[in-house]
Amino acid sequence: MKIFNKLIFLIIQCILIISVTNAQVDCGGTDNPYPIYNELPVLINQTTYGKLYKIGPPDNLINIIELYGTPYQRGLAQGQLLKSEINDIFDNFFGYITVMVNELVTKYADYLPKFLVDALEEGGVGLALDITADLTKKYTPKSFFEEMQGIADGSGIEYKTILRLHMFPELIKAACSMVGAYNSATLNKGLLQLRALDFGFDPMNPLRLHPTVMIYHPESVSAGGDGGHEFATLSWAGFLGTLTGYSQHVGICEKYWFGYNGTSSREGIPFHFLLREIIQFDESIDEALNRIINADRTCSVFMGLGSNQTNTFKAVEYSYEYVRVFDDQTPFPSYVPTPSAHPVIQDVVYIDKFVQPSNHQCLASVLQKSLGSIDVTSLINAAAQLQTGDIHIGIYDYQQNQMYVSVGTQSGPYPPPSNFTIVPAYARQFIQIDLNSFFNQ
């Protein structure tokens, strides 16, 4: 009977895959027209504990910063090398985030803890961020506070302001998409991971201004550091949490879980700090899952975990109440009938930018067309066709130890004039970063 049921399930999945593949799906976007930029980064400046590079064409420059030493020393180096950029973001951040959070509370008040909604109404975003900082403090490793103090000392910005900025991911709802493709699904049979961050892209968003790839070289515990291995994150100047990140062992990504209807809390470790701990300390998906399961969890997000050890990718439903894990053979989501638009695809795990369960056929259709030959270009075009990844996109090639990044328009006057046009990351040129030249120094 079990064999019969499994056979029926496989037949149904095949029918769903064929129907999605053969359907005329209007994704809304078109392929990305630009070649990948692959020139080397240029060293701009350095301090005792850091080096600053620029990479990209003149109209699409990205910072790369290497950070060495203890948490405080790494923070100090970032604050010194990116002082003007950090001040630029922080000077404009709270006005923008106030508008964004107020709009989100109007839409999603039912998904936020009541005390946070009350705090936003009574004391504004500042009070809500302060309460979040207080509730998460005892669950957050002290190394994060030391690194924030270093950023404050290096940049000249008040520590409390630095701390507040690092609490906002707990309040904001980012759409985002993720894909992990591996083994038979990819051209080189290695693991490729796509992370597309959709995060309120408009000309007034200061988080678009100074995109930065941060490459960490942690000092060993025996030498007074926090230990762990080297890793890279794609973020913006002054932010040390991780929403997009990769090491030679694991890679991570995330997406807000809009459909979660269970209990939430803010007493726990901020999810973006936990994600950074994964890429700094964990060497496999199992180790990352162990960290997730045993963590004091807060809000609800989907997480993506890739592993060089097993050459696989898994998606995680991460919430205060429970953790669920999905691989390429697990119907997604598990608690409702699998939408026909989200068929199981061998050696591919994916979640699109829409509220889940999603009935949008685009991503599955695009992946099916490239199945067996998925490469970096395939994932670049998948993001462009789905029109996902407005602030930034990261693609990790585990086999070659490469990171490909694209960012939304970061140059031009700020505040921008009313007629200022910006271009989202998915429609801009991708930049290749060879992590072999930065890791294992």
Curated annotation (Swiss-Prot):
Entry keyword set: Glycoprotein, Secreted, Signal
Compartments (UniProt record): Secreted
GO cellular component, one term: extracellular region
Signal peptide: 1-23
Glycosylated sites: N45, N261, N308, N419
Primary location class: secreted
Triggers of expression: Down-regulated by Pseudomonas aeruginosa, PAO1 strain and up-regulated by Pseudomonas aeruginosa, PA14 strain infection.
Domain of life (superkingdom): Eukaryota
Name the UniProt record assigns to this protein: Protein dcd1A
